[in-house]
Swiss-Prot record:
GO terms for biological process: envenomation resulting in negative regulation of voltage-gated potassium channel activity in another organism. The keyword Repeat applies. This is Boophilin-G2. It is found in: Secreted. Keywords: Blood coagulation cascade inhibiting toxin, Disulfide bond, Hemostasis impairing toxin, Protease inhibitor, Pyrrolidone carboxylic acid, Repeat, Secreted, Serine protease inhibitor, Signal, Toxin. GO terms for cellular component: extracellular space. Interacts with host thrombin and trypsin. The modification Pyrrolidone carboxylic acid is found at residue 16. It holds the Pfam family Kunitz_BPTI. Residues 21-71, 89-139 form the BPTI/Kunitz inhibitor domain. The keyword Methyltransferase does not apply.
Length: 142
């Protein structure tokens, strides 16, 4: 009986802590274009969306790593969005169509290294990573 109570308490605590992961992406009521991540329950992955800067809900993370810690990390390299080498590693760096100034990483096929570039916050291509580690995990292991 004590075992069942413990399981019920732990299950309730876990569900409350991560219940926000089931919320849909919510850009909020303001009009900024801030790149953020939310946990997409349909794909089971953290996905980028544009946040307006105010309002919204708790399924809103500054980095893909924060989203994965809270809601679930991919189990394999191929679980990353854009993990296909041809689309996720071969294209040249693309700053996109917005005017943000975000430091990102891309895989440079000529040098065989992950390098920094400035991302505008929207558009671009899949060769766009939050960190050098993520870039290397996806592109150097293929």
């Amino acid at each position: 009986m004590k075992y069942l109570i413990l399981l019920a308490v732990l299950g309730t605590a876990f569900a409350q802590r991560n219940g926000f992961c089931r919320l849909p992406a919510d850009e909020g009521i303001c009009k900024a274009l801030i790149p953020r991540f939310y946990f997409n329950t349909e794909t089971g992955k953290c996905t980028m969306f544009s946040y307006g800067g105010c309002g919204g809900n708790e399924n809103n993370f500054e980095t893909i790593e924060d989203c994965q810690k809270a809601c679930g990390a991919p189990e394999r390299v191929s679980d990353f969005e854009g993990a296909d080498f041809k689309t996720g590693c071969e294209p040249a760096a693309d700053s996109g169509s917005c005017a943000g100034q975000l430091e990102r990483w891309f895989y440079n096929v000529r040098s065989g290294e992950c390098e920094t570039f400035v991302y505008g916050g929207c558009g671009g291509n899949d060769n766009n990573y939050e960190s050098e580690e993520e870039c290397e995990l996806v592109c150097k292991n293929m």
